[in-house]
């Protein structure tokens, strides 16, 4: 019986420590998601820039 109390106490302490995080999560995660989408769009435009230039030059040669 004493062992089960000790085991229960250790389990309760483990659950309490596991549920506490050192860094609090921001309340406005929506803005972080919007920022992430904007970053992806910006990176896509930067990567597509040289390809768009080549296509523009190819159409200029075709005229």
UniProtKB/Swiss-Prot annotation:
Q: Which residues form the propeptide?
A: 23-26
Record-listed Leucine amide modification sites: 61
Q: Name one GO cellular component term.
A: extracellular region
Organism encoding this protein? Hyphantria cunea (Fall webworm moth)
InterPro entries, sorted: Cecropin
Biological process per Gene Ontology, one example term = antibacterial humoral response
On the tree of life, the source organism's domain of life is Eukaryota
- Where does this protein reside within or beyond the cell? Secreted
Q: Give the similarity note.
A: Belongs to the cecropin family.
Secretion signal span: 1-22
The protein's name is Hyphancin-3G
Instruction: Kindly state which keywords UniProt assigns to this record, in alphabetical order.
Output: Amidation, Antibiotic, Antimicrobial, Immunity, Innate immunity, Secreted, Signal
The record's function comment reads: Has antibacterial activity.
A Pfam family (short name) is: Cecropin
